């Protein structure tokens, strides 16, 4: 009898704690009002990769050699398509160009990477001015990534991102050093 009462009290205590300490909600961005011919203007242009979070360090390992990454997001050549170009500055100073195409899903900003059917990307708003968050999932990994219009956003932005992702049980955290100058983006 005592064990049943104790279990019930612990259960109620858990419910109470869960209701008090819930993770803050971040709304997923949508294409609301867009006629399918272009992506919402505020999200096009240049972005800097600031930080990442994942359940394990292995899911962030691809970013270990990175000092900084600068991206350019542009409307694609066909409706519901985005073209991304990036230049990665490695910690040893090399510049590595990359480009890929995202396909938008109708009515929201779920992105599918062309040539990688297992990869899914969702865009989320950020409380940080000039910021955006992405959640990438694929075969064997999931991670949140923080981007900003500035290569050096306020420290509070990074702290809020880390707090949010930690609350979601993403315990591994990576902050890009951004010690070197960003590489120039190629125009093609």
From Swiss-Prot:
One Gene Ontology molecular-function label: antioxidant activity
Which locations, inside or outside the cell, does it occupy?
A: Secreted
- The residues that the entry says bind tetradecanoate are 136, 143
Tell me the domain of life: Eukaryota
Print the keywords alphabetically: Disulfide bond, HDL, Lipid transport, Secreted, Signal, Transport
Signal sequence coordinates: 1-22
Q: Name one Pfam family in it.
A: ApoM
Gene Ontology cellular-component annotations: discoidal high-density lipoprotein particle; high-density lipoprotein particle; low-density lipoprotein particle; spherical high-density lipoprotein particle; very-low-density lipoprotein particle
Give disulfide pairs as residue numbers. Answer: 23-167, 95-183, 128-157
Any one GO biological process? high-density lipoprotein particle remodeling
Keyword Signal attributed: yes
Similarity comment: family membership: Belongs to the calycin superfamily. Lipocalin family. Highly divergent.
Q: What does this protein do?
A: Probably involved in lipid transport. Can bind sphingosine-1-phosphate, myristic acid, palmitic acid and stearic acid, retinol, all-trans-retinoic acid and 9-cis-retinoic acid.
Assembly, per entry: Interacts with LRP2; LRP2 mediates APOM renal uptake and subsequent lysosomal degradation.
Which protein, by its recorded name, is this?
A: Apolipoprotein M
Q: Which gene encodes it?
A: APOM
